[in-house]
């Protein structure tokens, strides 16, 4: 079994404050990254998108497209050898299917390529219980997550039905937007990664985040987690803090309808243990941080290091991310930040919420049934443990989320 690798684990976690970051513009694509696995991912995505650009878009996907893969082995790689390993393998799963999904989610392949290859992805200090590591594309539009070989197998199991569901809902969903799945091999280290759209905004900073399952047993962030700059808090933290999501009736109705439909689909596939990821942007707090950043930048003026601020690198004028006019505080582009919802007028604070379902690849199999039996013995039959069957899980999940929206 392949386990998640150390994709950039040696790099310090990036700060979450609204502070200007810098990167060295890569005029020629050098795929420069601190981790050779990241360099190979950048190289592979660039190669894949270039190859796909020469393949005619089919009228419809065929059954074989859901089993297909493309792979390349590179030996004695001499070009750009100071940045790239000399021996590596890159494999892309179901390239035609994921290209079709990107299109249905309104993502242009050229923009996707730019986001993942113009500058190295940034390390993210989030870490799943499974040990998965996360990176964010430099422009914060996409999340790169290490997964296991079992996750890859489960993804293949559900991909056909997932694609059909995305077609039927016209890409309007709270489910993860799966955009690409790859295997990377460098110096005998093999990892699998999946790329999804970032739930959070690429420009509005999140000051508080929650992972909610609708369960209360062992659902509190650890002291170690709470010590982080942006900890991932859980159900009991949400309840104990008296937190609420303040959205108007229309937004609440639309959100819950989407959530119900998505969760029913997951229950049909016998999937469970998923969460609602919630990120909260505080408009006034962000404005204050922006003022402080501008004051600090004024003090640092004249200390140029030859680098450019994060955004569109000088050689990529076509990147649509920054081509639109500047937005006012608390405003966002719904075509990019697709999960954003503004608070209602009577909210105690001016906030923007980013909410979507994550971690949907857990199938209710014999292992989960055994875990459920063990936890029932430990906590009692009435306890709200997370390992219940998919139908129970979905009902409890929907009930909990319905109660936190006000």
Swiss-Prot record:
Residues 33-405 form the PIPK domain. Its EC number is 2.7.1.149. The modification N6-acetyllysine is found at residues 89, 145. Residues 288-329 are annotated as: Disordered. One of its GO terms (biological process) is regulation of autophagy. It holds the Pfam family PIP5K. It is found in: Cell membrane; Nucleus; Lysosome; Cytoplasm. Changing residue 138 to F: Abolishes catalytic activity. Its main location: membrane. Gene3D superfamilies: 2-Layer Sandwich, Phosphatidylinositol Phosphate Kinase II Beta. Residues 289-304 have a biased composition (Acidic residues). The modification N-acetylalanine is found at residue 2. It is an enzyme of class 2 (transferase). Residues 59-65 are annotated as: Required for interaction with PIP5K1A. GO terms for cellular component: autophagosome; cytosol; lysosome; nucleoplasm; photoreceptor inner segment; photoreceptor outer segment; plasma membrane. Keywords: Acetylation, ATP-binding, Cell membrane, Cell projection, Cytoplasm, Kinase, Lipid metabolism, Lysosome, Membrane, Nucleotide-binding, Nucleus, Phosphoprotein, Transferase. Phosphorylated in tyrosines. Phosphorylation is induced by light and increases kinase activity. PANTHER family: PHOSPHATIDYLINOSITOL 5-PHOSPHATE 4-KINASE TYPE-2 ALPHA (PTHR23086:SF21), PHOSPHATIDYLINOSITOL-4-PHOSPHATE 5-KINASE (PTHR23086). Catalyzes the phosphorylation of phosphatidylinositol 5-phosphate (PtdIns5P) on the fourth hydroxyl of the myo-inositol ring, to form phosphatidylinositol 4,5-bisphosphate (PtdIns(4,5)P2). Has both ATP- and GTP-dependent kinase activities. May exert its function by regulating the levels of PtdIns5P, which functions in the cytosol by increasing AKT activity and in the nucleus signals through ING2. May regulate the pool of cytosolic PtdIns5P in response to the activation of tyrosine phosphorylation. This is Phosphatidylinositol 5-phosphate 4-kinase type-2 alpha. It comes from Homo sapiens (Human).
């Amino acid at each position: 079994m392949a386990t998640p690798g150390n994709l950039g684990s040696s790099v310090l976690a990036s700060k979450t404050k609204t502070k200007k970051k810098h990167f060295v513009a890569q005029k020629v694509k050098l795929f420069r990254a601190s981790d050779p696995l990241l360099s190979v991912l950048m190289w592979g995505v660039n190669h894949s998108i270039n190859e796909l650009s020469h393949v005619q878009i089919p009228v419809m996907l065929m059954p074989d497209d859901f089993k297909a893969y493309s792979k390349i082995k590179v030996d004695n790689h001499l070009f750009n050898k100071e940045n790239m390993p000399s021996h590596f393998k890159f494999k892309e799963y179901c390239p035609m299917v994921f290209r079709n999904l990107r299109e249905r989610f309104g993502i242009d392949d050229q923009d996707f390529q730019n986001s993942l290859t113009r500058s190295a992805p940034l390390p993210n200090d989030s870490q799943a219980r499974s040990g998965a590591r996360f990176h964010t594309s430099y422009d914060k539009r996409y999340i790169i997550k290490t997964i296991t070989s079992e996750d890859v197998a489960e993804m293949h199991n559900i991909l056909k039905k997932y694609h059909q569901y995305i077609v039927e809902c016209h890409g309007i969903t709270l489910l993860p937007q799966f955009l690409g799945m790859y295997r990377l091999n460098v110096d005998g280290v093999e990892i699998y990664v999946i790329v999804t759209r970032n739930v959070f905004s690429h420009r509005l900073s999140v000051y508080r985040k929650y992972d909610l399952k609708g369960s209360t047993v062992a659902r509190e962030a650890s002291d170690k987690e709470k010590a982080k700059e942006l900890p991932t808090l859980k159900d009991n933290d949400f309840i104990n803090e008296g937190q609420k999501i303040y959205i108007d009736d229309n937004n609440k109705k639309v959100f819950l309808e989407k959530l119900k439909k998505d969760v029913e689909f997951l229950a049909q596939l016998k999937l469970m243990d998923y969460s609602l990821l919630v990120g909260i942007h505080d408009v006034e707090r962000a404005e204050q941080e922006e003022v402080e950043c501008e004051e600090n930048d004024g003090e640092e003026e004249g200390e140029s290091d030859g680098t450019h601020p994060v955004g569109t690198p000088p050689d990529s004028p076509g990147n649509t991310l920054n081509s639109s006019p500047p937005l006012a505080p608390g405003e966002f582009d719904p075509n990019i930040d697709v999960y954003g919802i503004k608070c209602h007028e009577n909210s105690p604070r001016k906030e923007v919420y980013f909410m979507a379902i994550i971690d949907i690849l857990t199938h209710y199999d014999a292992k989960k049934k055994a875990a459920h039996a063990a936890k029932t013995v430990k906590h009692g039959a009435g306890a709200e443990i997370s390992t219940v069957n998919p139908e129970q899980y979905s009902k409890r999940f929907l009930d909990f989320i319905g109660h936190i929206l006000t």
